[in-house]
Amino acid sequence: MFCLLISEEGRAQTFECGLISSVAQAGVRFRFMSGRNDSELRLCADLYHVIDGKNSCPGGLASYFIRFNAAEWKINDEVRVQFNAGPGASAGYVMDNSDRRGVVAGMSGMASFDFRFNSGLSVSAGFSAILGCHTGKKNGNTTLTFYHNGIYRAWIPEISINYRF
């Protein structure tokens, strides 16, 4: 990310930074906008069973998406609404269902509505899913299983507040 910010092409891009929050995860979001397609990097704490008190420590998850601007509407001179969707990849160290913590890796996808204001502020509401594998320990052995939470928790909405530089 540092190389992208200091390169000539990186400086020509619009950069957006913000906070993302949901019942499933909370973290930071970095978005690089160039033309019609954007890229997004998320670094989040996975909050599975943290909010309900069953787990005291969150997991960590990093996701990268290519965002395609599918539609855009102008509400007035100050506000635009964009619909974005796209594929990506995710990796981290999280819990899956009632299993212990383990490494997760997989393909991911996202869709969101972005409310963009001329002041540089934007508010996004969307969803993301992960189709991947999870490693865990069962009876002292390491197992590789389908990552259930990536699909089960895809319906949980995510809200983010961002500032454009």
Language model segments and positions:
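Sec/Tat signal peptide C-region and signal peptidase I cleavage site
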Residues: 6-12
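Short N-terminal segments immediately surrounding and downstream of signal-peptide cleavage
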Residues: 14-28
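Solvent-exposed loop and beta-edge segments used for protein-protein assembly and interaction
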Residues: 22, 35, 79, 151-153
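Gram-negative (and chloroplast) outer-membrane scaffold detector with strong preference
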Residues: 31-121, 161-163
